[in-house]
Amino acid sequence: MMILKAIFFIIVLVSISCSKTNTENQPSTNEDLIMWYNKPATDWMTEALPLGNGYIGSMFFGGVPTEEIQFTEGSLWTGGPDSHPKYNFGNNNPDAHEFLPVLRELMAEDRFDEANELAQKELTSKIQYARPTQYYGEFGAQQNLGSFFITVTTDKAYSISDYKRGIDLNTGHGFVQYTSDGIDYKRTYFGNYPDKVMVYRFESSEPSSYTISLSTPHYTSGFAMYGNIISKTGYLEDNNMRFHVNSRIDSDGSVHCSGDTIYVNNANYFVLYNAAATSYKNEFPHYSGNNPMQICNTIFDNIASSTYNDILNNQLSDYQELFNRVELELGKGNNDKPIDERLVDYSNYTQDLGLEEIYFQYGRYLMISGSRKGGM
């Protein structure tokens, strides 16, 4: 904990004097700002890597042969006025003020333990209407929308070499690359804020085949494929908030759907474009009323004539206009090692100025990816 505090203190001090404006938005080649691992993630919290476009956030594991990309939309929350007829805006405790005089008296008498116990009991929210799917009563929580599972299908024994996954902070791109049975595989992921889509590109040096499925823990009320666009509709049990997901597959191979599984065959590449929306509307008193299907369809209509390079260039221009405003140079890092090994070394007091630089810029990457105008 002390080490992390030291990193935070250093980057805050240095950042005050290291800001500059860059309007050219040219791709950077700073390899010190590439954070990478040499193995797939097994834990969502500590190893999976985040992406976002201000509306959708996703976490990718980099699995082989199956990739999992977990994602959600920023407004997909339980709770709210539609979660219960007697909703009072979040476990409100209307009697809390009555205990303030007693608390003040206890504190004046230096009876702090008693004051703390009373405050914990009477000044905090009272959980109401708890039920199996609403453990904290009216206190809602962000929900996982679901996961894409994308599997390379092959009859060969699946051995891999030269594995690498990570995030290039210069571009805001996630990546996975490896070799299996003489075939080079490459994945490029990014969130595009201007076009409101998440983009996942899979490439291979020889034609390959894939299966793609979308799993959600919530109730679904519709699944359809028309052309190269797949859609899924569902809702939350807690407050009946509706959500919709559109996915578009572009590929040089064949694409078809059977049941709720998408098959991409004989492809050197395919690109999965993902849009998601909910019925949330920022209007009192119900905060509901948007049409998520219409929102997603409009997003896809707007990119209907756009190529992958168009969408890529839009993302780079938008991201780098913000990211390139600040440079921080503390010294050479140990970027020949994966980030998890560097963290272990750092915890053992091995100097790694580049790691401190990465953490500073990684924080900025998360803010750019997760908090944009129009989002939550």
What are these regions (language model features)?
Residues 2-10:
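Sec-dependent signal peptide recognition
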Residues 12-13, 247:
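Prokaryotic Sec-type signal peptides and long signal-anchor helices
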